[in-house]
Design a protein with these regions (language model features):
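Metallocarboxypeptidase
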Residues: 1-189, 194, 199-204, 228-253, ...
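Generic structural detector for well-ordered beta-strands
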Residues: 185, 226, 269-273
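Short amphipathic, basic-aromatic surface patches that mediate peripheral association
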Residues: 200-215
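Extended low-complexity, serine/threonine- and proline-enriched intrinsically disordered segments
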Residues: 213-233
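Low-complexity, intrinsically disordered segments enriched in Ser/Thr together with acidic residues
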Residues: 258-277
Length: 277
């Protein structure tokens, strides 16, 4: 299924306080971008489904996006595609946007029927009619075509939904770490001895470790740099240089202390023996 027109994010079983502050800033920034591109509100699963189970607990544990964040450190979203309610002119509450899906009023129902008549030619609601059921006797059959309009976008709206949500997915991918070697200098100091200097930079938005949660989970490997074609005299052929911050760190520093330098680059140097130009 997919319905509701909302961007769901972690956490699922607990509140936002369980997320490290810097990760929370990133999640909120991604959510703002998603809201702008898709028109959907962004909310944690924990807030979107406040119903309690028979033991007085929220029944939202076990979400896949919570696992990908908690165990893999990946900022993940579950998109409930197709916002029928907003298309029909039904206003969503900011703090509980799924409520209009769970608790439909008579006024909302009339707006949905009007949308069906004016935008869909009335095809997605079947008028109730009697039917003789072999076991149940006389019954009535009719109502909404759930798969065609309630749980999925009608065909004439599908392309627009796909374009807006694909744009959000591409934008998320563009925010990942992006390691690059911006400058390399080679200084010849003897016939077969050279000093090599290289500036390693993270040009991406996220830090090289991805998220604070990835570091907590112990899966964020440090950046490694390796040289080939020469034998190091000073310096290692392959070395770990730790992690490099991304542009997201500048956002946090600006709010807290004003503009500052982001540690997103590392200058490395080797003395090597070899031949070449």
């Amino acid at each position: 299924h997919t319905m509701g027109g909302v961007l769901l994010r972690s956490p699922c079983a607990v509140g936002d306080s369980a997320i490290p502050p810097r990760d929370m800033e990133t999640y909120q920034k991604m959510g703002e971008i998603g809201e702008r591109l898709t028109g959907y509100p962004c909310t944690p699963v924990y807030d979107a489904f406040p119903e309690l189970d028979d033991r007085g607990r929220r029944n939202t544990s076990g979400g896949f996006i919570e696992w990908t964040y908690d165990h893999l450190g990946i900022f993940s979203f579950a998109t409930e595609l197709w916002d029928l309610q907003s298309r029909a002119g039904i206003e969503k509450p900011a703090k509980d946007p799924m409520r209009v899906v769970r608790e439909q009023t008579e006024e909302d129902g009339l707006k949905l029927l009007k949308f069906n008549d004016e935008q869909l030619g009335g095809r997605c609601f079947v008028r109730w009619s009697e039917f003789e059921h072999p076991q149940l006797g006389t019954v009535e059959i009719g109502g909404w075509k759930l798969k065609e309009v309630r749980q999925n976008a009608p065909s004439e709206f599908l392309l627009d939904e796909c374009e807006r949500n694909a744009a959000f997915s591409v934008r998320q991918a563009a925010m990942t770490p992006k390691l690059a070697i911006q400058d390399v200098e080679v200084e010849k100091i003897a016939d077969d001895a050279f000093v090599i200097r290289a500036l390693v930079v993270n040009e991406g938005y996220l830090p090289s470790y991805g998220s604070e949660m990835a570091q907590r989970a112990g899966i964020a490997k440090p950046v490694e740099v390796q040289i080939e074609g020469a034998e190091p005299i000073i310096g290692k052929k392959k070395q770990a240089i730790g992690h490099l911050q991304g542009r997201s760190a500048a956002r946090g520093m600006m709010f807290a202390f004003g503009a500052g330098k982001v540690e997103n680059e590392r200058l490395l140097e080797w003395l090597v023996r070899g031949t070449g130009e």
